[in-house]
Design a protein with these regions (language model features):
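Extended, non-globular alpha-helical segments
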Residues: 29-42, 376-410, 451-486, 491
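Conserved N-terminal/central alpha/beta ligand/cofactor-binding core
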Residues: 32, 41-49, 67, 73-74, ...
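N-terminal propeptides
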Residues: 16-20, 456-619
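Glycine-rich Rossmann-fold phosphate-binding loop(s) that bind the pyrophosphate
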Residues: 55-59
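Short, well-ordered coil/turn residues at beta-beta hairpins
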Residues: 167, 183-184, 407
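Flavin (FAD/FMN)-binding glycine-rich loop and adjacent Rossmann-like elements that form
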Residues: 172, 179, 188-433, 437-455
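Extreme N-terminal leader/targeting segments of oxidoreductases
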Residues: 1-52, 131, 145-146
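Conserved beta-strand-loop-beta-strand element in the redox core of flavoprotein oxidoreductases
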Residues: 155-174
Length: 619
């Protein structure tokens, strides 16, 4: 039930061929007070108090700080680096993952749209982006900025943060506030404050499973015209090019042989800089703990050593690269995933792929659920492509701390939902929401938890967001599958990452299932959803004969299911096995018939997998 790795790579490349041009519908003008009318914020000195403190100068943090400042409150933005922009300006990710609606209207507006317009589109010059972020912040006199300031720890009183300790120029300093926003990549403030969280795919029972990290590298002396001609003449498969970017190139990446299996060159995302040089996002590094500075430093060294060989390979492989020169690499790695905080609501894959609109929606997204490779044994999977889904305010509100919001990729998303929700434009939209909510909560003197529970307060926050330029349309997208008899089973296997629907959302409900696919589906479901890896291990030898790529009959499906329930199913004839499994509610024979030689389809397999886990949970 999983696409072959090669197909996944090609489909990912083809998808990106279709979304190059910026395509926005009518955008409402922002209703904003003159920033000069705001009382200035005090300078970032030790012991200073603010209304709102934002930790993290990532794009999401800039959005949060600017959004709060637009509401007239006094804000401090704390950033450990010497500038703003984080992943965009220090990880050199200069190729934006855009989110469009059904009519190609831009979904992520507000501060992101401001940034997008000022940098000139979805591919930008890193130096320009860094300046744009700085200019955004400096526009507001009530927004103070403290660079080169590393968060150290929160000051807690019960379930509230009253201040933070930070280090600047070797000296410890303290800032106080009534509201805090964690916009760090790894939710470091939330974690230090005691907010519970999972790491990587821990919420699926696989804590060591994390998406590959990437080192973006910098090449010069590129003949862009020669590359453009080759792409447009079709001499390079699955590639697309404009005056600012080129992408695809799946065959090129696949042809490179790295010096170690911990590295892989995937399809190339190439973004031009204003000086004609290029940045390439393609080099994947496996086995990296994004929460360990030692692990990241080792990964950086490993990747940097590989870059001369990659450059030489591209010189030989790509038109226009014959004289390519390696100019360096990003100062930081592109880490796609570390923590996922536990929030009042955990956005999951079904919410994303079935286009859920929440009553407390504060941002919209549509980016495909693109989970990058987690090991050298896979190339990553596109679990599906939503039309439009929403992020609920509750997913920004962490459990256990009353006056903190978390924005960006480490907010309240499951591992799989984050495959879409992690992208920066969505993160900046959540930053806008956090800034507005922080200011509003001060006005009404309510905690974020209280706001989340009050529909009237949420409506006020949504209205303020729209006035500030956000886009929160309820598309009321109907799901044609919700009346299907196997829909609960489909949602179950989808929630646990047991099927891969691809860019076309092919759920394979009517497709025949083979024995091996059903074995792995049920085994992984028991491990991930029921926490019964012990049961899977205990039955592995007995079920080994099912590891065959041949059609799955209903009789064999029944035997496998009954084996997990502790029965000697091998002794049953196929018809008796089907009858017994049906009696236990494992097989929907009223929908599919009871022929033991009938071939099981996806719908029946999903139904059976969900029912198996439900029964095992009662053993």
């Amino acid at each position: 039930m999983v696409w072959p790795a090669r197909m996944a790579m090609l489909e990912r490349a083809r998808y990106h061929l279709t979304i190059w041009q910026a395509r926005s519908g009518q955008v409402l003008a922002r209703q904003e007070r003159d920033p000069s009318s705001f009382p200035p914020a005090p300078p970032a000195l030790d012991g200073t108090r603010y209304d709102v403190v934002v930790v993290g100068g990532q794009p999401e943090g800039v959005a949060a700080a600017v959004s709060a400042a637009r509401q007239g409150v006094k804000v401090l933005l704390v950033e450990k680096r010497d500038g703003l922009g984080g992943l965009f300006t220090y990880g050199w990710l200069n190729f934006i993952d855009m989110n469009y609606g059904p009519k190609q209207e831009l979904l992520t507006r507000g501060t992101f749209l401001d940034f997008y317009r000022q940098v000139g589109g979805s591919v930008f010059d890193v130096a320009v982006a860094k300046k744009v972020f700085r200019d955004m912040v400096e526009r507001y006199p009530n927004l103070a900025l403290s660079l080169n300031t590393a968060f150290k720890e929160p000051i807690m009183e019960g379930g509230r943060i009253t201040g933070i300790k930070a280090v600047r120029e070797g000296q410890e300093i303290t800032f106080y506030a009534d509201r805090f926003i964690d916009a760090t990549q790894d939710a470091v403030v939330a974690a230090a404050a005691g907010v519970p969280y999972t790491v990587g795919a821990e919420d699926m029972g696989e804590p060591e499973r994390r998406q590959a990290v990437t080192l973006v590298f910098h090449l010069g002396n590129i003949d862009w015209g020669a590359l453009e001609q080759a792409v447009k003449e079709g001499r390079i498969k699955d590639a697309k090019i404009s005056d600012r970017a080129a992408w695809g190139f799946a065959d090129v990446g696949a042809a490179y042989q790295p010096s170690t299996p911990r590295l892989r060159l995937r399809g190339l995302n190439i973004g031009r800089q204003n000086d004609g040089t290029i940045l390439i996002n393609a080099l994947q590094i496996f086995g990296v703990d994004g929460l360990s500075e030692v692990s990241k430093a080792e990964a950086m060294e490993l990747a940097q050593k590989e870059l001369p060989a990659i450059t030489a390979f591209l010189r030989e492989r790509l038109p226009g690269f014959g004289g390519a020169k390696l100019l360096g690499a990003a100062p930081e790695l592109y880490v796609r995933e570390t923590r996922h905080i536990k929030a009042l609501y955990q956005l999951d894959l079904n919410d994303v792929l079935f286009n859920r609109y929440f009553p407390d929606a504060i941002a919209l997204g549509s980016y495909p659920v693109d989970v990058q490779a987690t090991s050298p044994q896979d190339t990553g999977y596109v679990y599906g492509r939503p039309e439009v889904y929403s992020i609920p305010f509750r997913s920004l509100v962490p459990q256990g701390v009353d006056n903190l919001l978390v924005v960006g990729r480490s907010a309240g998303y499951t591992h799989l939902a984050a495959g879409s929700a992690r992208v920066v434009p969505i993160g900046m939209a959540t930053g806008d929401a956090a800034g507005v909510a922080a200011a509003y909560s001060l006005k009404v003197n309510k905690t974020f938890r209280d706001l989340a529970a009050d529909r009237a307060d949420i409506k006020e926050i949504q209205d303020l967001l729209v006035k500030a330029g956000a886009y929160l349309k309820d598309y009321q997208i109907k799901n044609p599958l919700e009346n299907h008899w196997a829909f609960n089973g489909l949602k179950f296997v989808n929630r646990w990452g047991l099927i891969v629907a691809g860019y076309n959302n092919d759920w394979k409900l009517d497709a025949p299932v083979n024995q091996a696919s059903f074995y792995y589906m049920t085994a992984n479901a028991l491990k991930r959803a029921a926490g019964r890896g012990d049961l899977v291990a205990a039955k592995a030898a007995v079920l080994k004969p099912y590891l065959q790529r041949e059609p799955l009959t209903r009789g064999n499906a029944a035997r496998l299911l009954l084996t997990y329930l502790g029965e000697d199913a091998a002794a049953l004839d196929p018809a008796a096995a089907v009858a017994r499994a049906a009696a236990k509610g494992l097989l929907p024979v009223d929908k599919t018939g009871s022929d033991p030689q009938g071939i099981v389809t996806g719908a029946e397999a999903y139904y059976a997998t969900e029912r198996l886990c439900a029964l095992v949970g009662k053993i």
